[in-house]
Structures are given as C-alpha cells and as structure tokens.
C-alpha cells in the first residue's frame, strides 16, 4: 500500500491522495479489534513518512467498527468511519454484536407484505423429502397442525428470510420460496386474514436487496 500511495502522490497529477482506509467485515468477517485497526494506523504513518505530509483521512472501516467508539478503544489516529447502516437502520450492531444504539430510530425502513393465504396445515411436509428450490435440505419439526399464512414476497426480494425481523413478536417465519414467504401465526393473539399487511424491521442485507428489487414498491414518507 505504501508504494501505491507514493505512486499516486508523486506521479498521478489528476488524483489527490486524501487518505487510506480499511474494510474488515464485509467479506472476511474480521472483527474490528483495536489491534487490527492499529495496523491501519501504522500503515498510515508509513505512508505519511514516504510522501512527506499528513494524510487527511484515516478511515477505520464501516458500521461494524463503530463498536470501538462505543467501547472507547478506537486507536488514536483514526479520524473517519464510513457509517451507513448504523445511521439508517440501525440493527446490525444490536443483533449481531449485542451493541444497542440508544437514541437512534430503528424504524426508518419498514417492509410491508400482504397476506395472500391463511390455512391450517401440517407443520411437517407430507411425502418423501429431498431438497428445496435452492438445493438445501431444511429441517422440519413436527408440531402437528398449525395456522400458516402465505406472504406475497420471497427470496428474490429480500435474499434471506432469517434476516427479517417481524414486528409481531408472536409469529415465526418458517421459510420461503423464490416469491412467497410462509409464517406460523398459531400463537399470535391477532387473527390474520387474507389482505392483511404484515410489517418487518430490516438489517443491512435484507434492506440492500429490497432497495434494489424492481418488484418492491418504495414509499417515502416525510412527516414534516
């Protein structure tokens, strides 16, 4: 990295070297520990020695690095975080790392889906079992006959149903096909009917897919 930064600084007149940054979690699932972020600071100092000036930006990662700020142990020298999810949602630090963000709205994005079927059905599929539409072998628990609802959305819209957070805490998402989602509402005090709207909170991955889906209507509400 030092050589690349020096090349930009010294030979690429149409580019300005503003700083250096790191991405730890998006692919490699590396935790942004103080030690890992200190490696970035050390690289930044080597770059500064090479180019003979201070860097404007030393970016310590994205939303997953914000827990270092909350713990008060982010290394000195990091002056930037590229935070998006924790401002817009915020859910990931709470559900994935156990860090609540007090004072932040967690309902900026709400997914709404319509109920298109309500029926009592066996909880364990009837027949010889193989794989689902995506080549997986789901595990089913026999709970007898359960009240199930079918929603008009599926894997194509939000990627992974396990990352949907129902606002009704008494329902269970059982699974999905490419364009439908199945929920168990047997234990819910609310009685569900065809045409009802079910609401979900989102985390980063589901929100990413929904925002890019042409099948999902986006409604912007300005309370002011």
List PLM regions with ranges.
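Active-site loop/helix belt of alpha/beta enzymes
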Residues: 1-109
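Residue-level marker of positions within ordered structural domains that often coincide
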Residues: 25, 63, 86, 120, ...
């Amino acid at each position: 990295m030092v050589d690349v930064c020096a090349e930009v600084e010294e030979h690429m007149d149409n580019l300005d070297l503003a700083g250096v940054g790191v991405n730890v979690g998006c692919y490699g699932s590396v935790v942004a520990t103080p030690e890992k972020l200190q490696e970035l600071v050390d690289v930044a100092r080597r770059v500064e020695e090479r180019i003979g000036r201070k860097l404007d930006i030393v970016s310590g990662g994205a939303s997953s690095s914000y827990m270092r700020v909350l713990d008060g142990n982010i290394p000195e020298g990091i002056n930037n975080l590229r935070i998006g999810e924790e401002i817009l949602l915020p859910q990931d630090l709470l559900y994935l790392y156990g860090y609540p963000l007090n004072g932040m709205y967690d309902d900026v994005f709400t997914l709404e889906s319509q109920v298109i079927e309500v029926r009592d059905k066996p909880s364990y599929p009837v027949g010889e079992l193989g794989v689902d539409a995506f080549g997986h072998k789901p595990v089913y628990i026999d709970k007898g006959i359960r009240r199930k609802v079918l929603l008009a959305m599926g894997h194509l819209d939000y990627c992974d149903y396990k990352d949907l957070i129902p606002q009704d805490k008494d329902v269970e998402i059982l699974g999905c096909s490419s364009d439908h989602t199945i929920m168990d509402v047997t234990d819910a005090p609310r009685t569900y009917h065809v045409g009802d709207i079910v609401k979900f909170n989102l985390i980063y991955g589901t929100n990413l897919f929904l925002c890019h889906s042409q099948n999902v209507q986006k409604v912007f509400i300005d309370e002011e």
